[in-house]
Amino acid sequence: MRCPYCGHLEDRVVDSRETQDGQATRRRRACLSCERRFTTYERIEDVLPQVVKKDGRREAFDRAKIVEGVATACQKRPVSTEQVEALVSAVERQVQELGEREIRTAVIGEAVMQRLRTLDEVAYVRFASVYRAFRDVGEFMTELAGLARKDGEER
């Protein structure tokens, strides 16, 4: 494994364990050159469906895009990297279980929002504001009112 800090190709595994969802192996590694530590995740490569974008373009399912979007929404929130990984793994599993050859971005986005809402409501609102591309403050306020209403019903 190439060290992300110095580029050296040799390292040693310091710790190895399964992630919470059991879908990957998390490994802490130490570079044999610069001695800095870094984390890698190992998972089985699955055949995932093509993603159909809003404009009709198709591209390969990209887990990293979902991780990036969720991590951005969770910035400065009490959400760990492991929680982000678990959320993305759950979405990825849901997509696989559908068994479709193609999936619309809307299905993926809704799955992410559903899980984010239970994880952290502020992160949910951040993600929804970008994903749903609110045109004005009124649409944003409507979403917040819906969130508050659903919270009231759950309590």
UniProtKB/Swiss-Prot annotation:
Zinc finger residue extent: unnamed: 3-34
Pfam families recorded: ATP-cone, Zn_ribbon_NrdR
Record GO biological process: negative regulation of DNA-templated transcription
Cofactor: Zn(2+)
Domain ATP-cone: from-to ranges: 49-139
Cofactor note: Binds 1 zinc ion.
PROSITE patterns the record matches: ATP_CONE (PS51161)
tRNA processing keyword on record: no
Molecular-function GO term, any one: zinc ion binding
Entry keyword set: ATP-binding, DNA-binding, Metal-binding, Nucleotide-binding, Repressor, Transcription, Transcription regulation, Zinc, Zinc-finger
Protein's UniProt keywords contain Transcription regulation: yes
Similarity remark: Belongs to the NrdR family.
PANTHER family: TRANSCRIPTIONAL REPRESSOR NRDR (PTHR30455:SF2)
Function text: Negatively regulates transcription of bacterial ribonucleotide reductase nrd genes and operons by binding to NrdR-boxes.
Protein name, entry field: Transcriptional repressor NrdR
